[in-house]
Amino acid sequence: MSDSEVEYDIAGSLNPGVDSEDDYSSGSESDSEIPDIIEDSEDETGPQQGEPGTMTFPNLELSDDDDDDDDDDEGRKKKKKKTDDSVESYFGAPQTGKKSSGSFAGLGLSQLVLKNIARKGFKQPTPIQRKTIPLVLEGKDVVGMARTGSGKTAAFVLPMLEKLKVHSAKVGARAVILSPSRELALQTLKVVKDFSAGTDLRLAMLVGGDSLEEQFKMMMSNPDIIIATPGRFLHLKVEMELSLASVEYICFDEADRLFELGFGEQMNELLASLPSNRQTLLFSATLPKTLVEFAKAGLHDPILVRLDAETKLPEHLEMTFFAVKENQRDACLAFILKEVIQMPFATPEQLKELERLDERAIDDGERDEDRKQKRPKFKKERLPPAHQLPSEKSTIVFCPTKHHVEYVIVLLQTLGYAVSYIYGTLDQHARKNQLYRFRTGKTSILVVTDVAARGIDVPVLANVINYSLPPSPKVFIHRVGRTARAGNRGWAYSIIKDNDIPYLLDLEVFLGRKLLTPRLFKQQNPDPSAEPDYVNTLTIGAPPRQALEIHGEELAQMVKDSYELQQLSEVAVKGERMYNKTKGSASQESAKRSKQIMALGWDDHHLMFGEDGESAKDALLARLGQKRIRETVFEFRKSKTTSGAEMMATRRAQLAPIQRRAAEKRAIQEKERLAGLVHSQDAEIARSTEEDMATEADLTGFTTEEDLRAAKKAQKSKKRSFRDSENFMSHYAPTNDDKGYAVGNFAGAASNATFDLINDGSEMQQKQGMKWDKKKGKFINAGSEGGKKFIRGEGGQRIAASFRSGRFDKWKAAHKVGNLKVGALEESGPATKRVLSAREFKHNKNEAPKRADKYRDDFHKQKTKVAAAKEDGRIQKPQPKSELKSTADVRKSRILAEKRKQKNARPSRGGRGGGRGGRGGGRGGR
């Protein structure tokens, strides 16, 4: 068995006394379709085994007592009854001796779902799955909060399949899963297909960029589950006049992104159309601590399942920060890749393979333009398993804007690395190709933006590099949370400048981890052999100065020699200028503390690189500089009696006591801080780790797991709090952790969103401010259009929410079908069967291209196509005309000759002169 195939004996786990090797053997069917990572939790015990005598799984066998007593009539009746109810029991939960949340069988899932889980090779549920699946099966509205890669997708897909079971003959979708991006929707579709194998459930994926006619056909096939992006789903809802009254189960995947800028209008339209008795789930890697504003989503008595407060970052993640100057960031990136990570350069074989893939991508693009050409099939390489690294040094580089992405990829390719890239406005086909190269190990570096990285399926990584520090702590967690998964170790390197220090201090407070400079570490640990803790502290320092200078000179020469790099560098600088204007500001307290951190040697030699050889030289220069008395320009080479010298002496006499008192105050504050006698920011950091979980006042309107468990045991009503949920104002300020998770109303989400990923370009930026309305004669909000409801289509354009183009009406008339009647039974007439079974006509003819016209713009391109067609034999050289006549040609020529004879033998009408007519009858007629 290969490493990519995992075998798990569920029958043996449920009943250790029965050998289940004959039942089935689970293995990974396709490693190319990897769902959202379902990690094995290391801190959980294995699945608890059932008591002897329980039935095996998945074959419905009798217990040991029934098998031994074959003559017992009662046993035969039981066996007959079980045989009759085999279908129902197969879709029901297995009868285990004791329910255990340590295994999927103990969560109440049916045997068919368990079989599909085992076939994919998953053994134990993750914490988010253990806590949410039983609640969802009970019909509760759940808000799930867990970091990226914790198995959130399976947490809502498995109970959905358990509830739907089989296809419904009634018209109307019963489950809807909304995703913020096409990539995430495709990933969710793969998971649903894997776990629904063996059922007759119908799926439909509705995303932008696909054919509307094909999606009309999908919706007319009465799907049970719809996986869609909000833009296209609302487009089809308006165009087809869909009714969502049949929806029983709706899930908002990556809910914080769905309810932010891009999909706010679409979500409000969709939520108003959903029935009130639906079950609503919200899942995301980052959700706010207070979820009162999400009441607009229609949650009824929701239960909050939050795991990120327990471990905000992966357990084995090591982090460090490199302090650089303004013009040293590129040199630091090259230094990290070459010296720290030791990234190998691209081999000649890799470069040839990448060139071949580029040529194939160009050919595919030309075939898309010329749809008559048939696309050749290439054998795709299988993706590695979820627990295996794409390559040994696989690294993601996060950039702030797409302009930085374009600059960095050219820079790294010039250095000799194999690089892939993805940003928000990249074409969907190009995204797939770039991600496929990175997943298969053909490239070792993936350069992305935050907007593009959300929803990208990269299970395991070795390193993460932040080209610039993100302004939000949660964006930082989302970035670095992609490494050190599934018990693996990983590194996160961040490049920061002096203006990033306030954001770094906000991150320090949010994570509850102490910022450690080289100077502070040496004061706390006099032992020179001591190593810093990169897991529990935020270690900062500067890379070796000499190495940075070498890489900086090399890159400067590269940029000087390349016109493309010069242009991209200028565009990236302008893009960063706009990015800094739009990103949020750090807290005032962090801005004040940043000066203290800079005074503590934040840019000293980094502890990772051992002793600093430059420090001794700097100390010597400092001592030499102190040998002479420092003089100002007013005193240099002037006598003491001049006015300037007297003024400086008076000023020094006045400032000396003030400077002395300030130095004494700083020394006292430092002693108090070390003694723990003051409530400083450090005390807030220490206290924030104890206040991660939400209090009762913070989670007003939400039920926690502990409350639900206590209510089931005691069967008593919970004592009502004296605090009014609407008017109560707390007497203490929220902690920094609360501020990080806080969210305002949706009207102000553009500026106060808790996890607002700044767009990597200006294409999706909304207008801000006021503009003059000529008709109204006053200023109005630039983002409003007179109160009309608009939606943003998949192309980015704003259209009216009630707009119908009539394409569905034309499609219905062409296929002779009617509207969907939600709630009615499916039609099985000939018209419906014809529509569902009809195949889309595709041009398969490989005709010769037209002759190239030198006056057209595509002359050279068409000339190349004609030359290729001649080589393929589609265009043949003209042959000489045959002189042999066929029987039909001979007969035709004889008939024509006979007609000429008859015409020439007619008598003339004229007189003399041969019938030339007129007077005289010819030449001599006079």
Curated annotation (Swiss-Prot):
It is an enzyme of class 3 (hydrolase). Residues 711-721 have a biased composition (Basic residues). It is found in: Nucleus, Nucleolus. Pfam families: DBP10CT, DEAD, Helicase_C. Residues 133-305 form the Helicase ATP-binding domain. Keywords: ATP-binding, Helicase, Hydrolase, Nucleotide-binding, Nucleus, Ribosome biogenesis, RNA-binding, rRNA processing. Residues 1-102, 362-387, 709-731, 835-926 are annotated as: Disordered. Belongs to the DEAD box helicase family. DDX54/DBP10 subfamily. This is ATP-dependent RNA helicase DBP10. The gene is DBP10.
